[in-house]
């Protein structure tokens, strides 16, 4: 199962699993994809189907109680993507801080002079193109953090309408109250719901009173970090992943709960191979 988990993580950056902790199905595991429980054992399909709706509501790594059954639900995340639309003055420090925070950073602008390595030396990817081409140029990625800082509400709405149709972890949009209002009205007129539009952080950033580009960038980064750390999730340890990919047999040890202070949190893992070597 872990090889499959790592494969999905490479594709989407996020995956959910569940393991039964008690009862007749103790030890059974499943992957949860698009709110459906996927088990390699067809005999347990009906069992998992009963809990699909409740599993879909789980957003963090923890033990959950569903009737008489206890589950350990894990949310794995990897390689958070920071995708910035607009290559102006605010975008430059946002990209720099994003890289410092461990994000893979992409910057897109429809002006070639605004997406250069001189302006964005820390970016991993620079894209010049129309914002209407967003879906063609940037693959959907669940562990994605989108920052819309284009120069006008037409660019904002072009980006937002495409992002709202795909999975994401964070979507923020810069702008005055009037600019944000115009964009919301346009998107509502196109059929997007109030619930969808309320998921957009607009105006973007925490209210720290910033005015200079670097100050605004700090407020944006702070809000992104706040959202990123809102739930307990399981991060992939590189040593554990390498061992699982290379070794044929072994045992995975997982912390499912803890009390008091500890350097390792819930979801932390250690892999032990058949020769007794430990990783993680």
Feature locations, PLM:
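Short amphipathic alpha-helix with an adjacent loop that forms part of the alpha/beta core around
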Residues: 132-142
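Adenosine-phosphate binding glycine-rich loop
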Residues: 174-242
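Segments forming oxygen-rich coordination pockets for charged ligands
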Residues: 1-110, 117-119, 141-144, 186-188, ...
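Short, glycine/polar-rich helix-capping loops at beta-to-alpha or helix-loop-helix junctions
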Residues: 112-117, 155-158
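Short glycine-rich anion-binding loops that position phosphate/pyrophosphate groups of nucleotides
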Residues: 23, 151-154, 176-177, 256-258
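ADP-ribose/adenylate-binding Rossmann-like module
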Residues: 106-108, 145-152, 161-186
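Conserved SAM-binding strand-loop segment of SAM-dependent methyltransferases
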Residues: 124-130
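Short glycine/serine/threonine-rich phosphate/pyrophosphate-binding segments
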Residues: 91-94, 154-159, 179-182, 264
């Amino acid at each position: 199962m872990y090889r499959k988990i790592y494969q999905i993580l490479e594709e989407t950056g996020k995956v959910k699993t569940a393991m039964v902790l008690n009862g007749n199905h103790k030890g059974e595991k499943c992957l949860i994809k698009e709110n459906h429980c996927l088990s390699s054992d067809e005999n347990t399909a009906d069992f998992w189907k009963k809990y699909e709706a409740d599993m879909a509501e789980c957003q963090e790594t923890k033990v959950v109680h569903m009737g008489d059954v206890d589950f350990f639900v894990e949310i794995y995340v990897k390689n958070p993507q920071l995708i910035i639309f607009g290559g102006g003055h605010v975008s430059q420090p946002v990209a720099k801080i994003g890289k410092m925070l461990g994000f893979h950073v992409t910057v897109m602008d429809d002006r070639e002079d605004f997406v250069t390595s001189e302006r964005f030396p820390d970016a991993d990817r620079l894209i010049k193109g129309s914002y209407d081409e967003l879906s063609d140029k940037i693959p959907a990625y669940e562990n994605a953090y989108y920052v819309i800082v284009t120069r006008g509400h037409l660019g904002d709405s072009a980006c937002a309408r495409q992002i709202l149709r795909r999975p994401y972890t964070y979507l923020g949009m810069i702008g005055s109250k009037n600019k944000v209002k115009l964009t919301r009205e346009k998107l509502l007129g196109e059929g997007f719901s109030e619930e969808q539009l309320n998921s957009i952080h607009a105006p973007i950033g925490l209210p720290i009173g910033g005015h200079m580009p670097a100050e605004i960038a700090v407020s944006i980064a702070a809000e992104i970090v706040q959202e990123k750390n809102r739930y307990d999730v399981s991060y992939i340890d590189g040593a554990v992943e390498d061992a699982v990919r290379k070794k044929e047999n072994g045992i995975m040890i997982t912390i499912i709960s803890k009390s008091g202070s500890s350097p390792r949190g819930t979801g932390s893992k250690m892999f032990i191979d058949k020769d007794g070597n430990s990783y993680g």
